[in-house]
Amino acid sequence: MNRFVQNICFTVLVLLYSVQGLCQTSTADNAEHDHAPQAAIASAHPLATQTGLAILEQGGNAFDAAIAVTAVLAVVEPYSSGIGGGGFYLLHQKEDDSYVMLDARERAPLRAHKDLYLDEQGEVIAGASINGASSAGIPGIPAALVHLADNYGNLKLPQTLAPAIGYAKDGFSVDEYYQRMATFRLKALQENSAASAIFLQQGEVPELGYKVIQRDLAKTLEIIAESGFSGFYENGLAWKMVRDVRKHGGIWTMKDMGTYAVKERSPEVVIYKGMRLVSASLPSSGGLVLSEILQMLAEFDLEEMDEVQRIHFIVEAMRRAYRDRAQYM
């Protein structure tokens, strides 16, 4: 395992167009909003969405579906959703109307320091924080899958991870988006023989329909399914990863792996025109940025504006919120 394309997996709800249609509300108007009669799954890839629905049909709950969807995305979206990264999960339990945010963000190695990506002259080493072993953080997604299954799911990991294991073993077909991302990262992939052998076709961007097969990833998912946290973070697989990262200039240690832990946090809550929105809290910036945008827009009657003015107000609110994020967060 000597590829270090760091992939960060995020479960994201994008609330940009029609906030009213996606929010819980504490007002009497709640009955007017449409709700899915059973379940709705949205993901970045049809195979992941189909898998989530299949898990629900097998008796799984929403958390089991989230595990399965995350794992399949880790297989079919290696450019953005791999298990080598981290993510956030926003959970709601109907029984007690409680919310929790799982913080499974990847973590910097304990030996990381502020000058890690500077040379002896104090200059930034180009690409060092993006490519290579020194750029890799301690993965959080495997721990998140285990945490979800142990604390919230109805099904066991061997069942929820089985579809992803199958796609990793048997392969999935390259689509146009995969081609675009492979083109974007072509140089980095070509410079790593292991990555090139898996994600490229004879060293070049694969043709449409080319099967990407990831047998080592399948084995890793099988280890997680069988042995949970210890299988990935404490035993032989962890030792192999640490050894390989250090061989290629990284600073991982077994302590980094063994001390990783998912954190349960209180989510960010904002009231917008009588509706309660629950979003991700720190260390994600999403909830705070969304809150700032909506608090600015709450001062205006967007429905009374013409389309051009409404878009202008929304864009300016977003621009200011993201400026604040860049400066203060």
Put a short name on every predicted segment:
Residues S18-V19:
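N-terminal signal peptide c-region/cleavage motif recognized by signal peptidases
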Residues E292:
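Protein kinase glycine-rich loop
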Residues F300-M329:
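Internal maturation/activation junctions in enzymes
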Residues M1-C9:
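Bacterial N-terminal signal peptides that target proteins for export
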Residues Q24-Q50, A54, A62-S227, F232-E234, ...:
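Noncatalytic scaffold domains of N-terminal-nucleophile
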